[in-house]
């Protein structure tokens, strides 16, 4: 019975499931003929890990790139032709990489970043830069506390949650708001 059919997302952290609100935003942007671009910048991982902690951090960064890639494919499927996903690689096309990095103020210090850009009809492109490590994920860095055993090693970082949809959709909605926020400061007034 077609009415009872449904998809069950068994991927880690439900990365292939997007909320109804996200679907509506992407469909509205497509209806407005707005251009949505996602630019993925990958930082350097740097060869062989120094220790277990560094190896775990590298594994988390790779996992975040994979999860973000899967989520962006879903966004592209929903948004259709209005959504474009671009993966920038400094080694494959250095000139295009440099040009995009300058356009979006990306630096090597930003490591893995996702740029969410929107160009509405008749308006200039607006963008927001998101860090995959701090904006799209909840990571328990474990601190430098030993594991409890005598001579124990420091606890390793753990990827607790991937919040890619929340951050990306929030950035999209924020880019659609027109005008600059205004703050009024009153001096000498009692409340």
Region spans (language model):
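Short, surface-exposed patches at the edges or C-terminal ends of soluble domains, predominantly
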Residues: 1-191
């Amino acid at each position: 019975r077609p009415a009872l059919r449904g998809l069950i997302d068994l991927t880690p952290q439900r990365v292939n499931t997007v909320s109804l609100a996200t679907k509506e935003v992407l469909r509205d942007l497509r209806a407005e003929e707005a251009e949505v671009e996602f630019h993925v910048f990958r930082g350097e991982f740097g060869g062989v890990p120094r220790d277990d902690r560094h190896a775990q951090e590298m594994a988390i960064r790779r996992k975040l790139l994979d999860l973000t890639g899967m989520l962006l494919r879903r966004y592209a499927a929903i948004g259709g032709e209005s959504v474009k996903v671009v993966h920038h690689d400094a080694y494959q096309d250095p000139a295009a990489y440099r040009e995009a990095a300058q356009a979006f103020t990306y630096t090597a210090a930003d490591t893995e970043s996702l740029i969410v850009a929107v160009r509405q009809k008749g308006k200039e492109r607006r963008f927001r830069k998101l860090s995959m490590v701090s904006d799209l994920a909840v990571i328990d860095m474990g601190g430098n506390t030993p594991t409890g055993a005598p001579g124990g090693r420091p606890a390793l970082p753990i990827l607790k949650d991937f919040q890619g949809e929340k951050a990306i959709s929030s950035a999209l909605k924020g880019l659609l708001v027109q005008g600059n926020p205004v703050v009024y400061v009153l001096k000498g007034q009692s409340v």
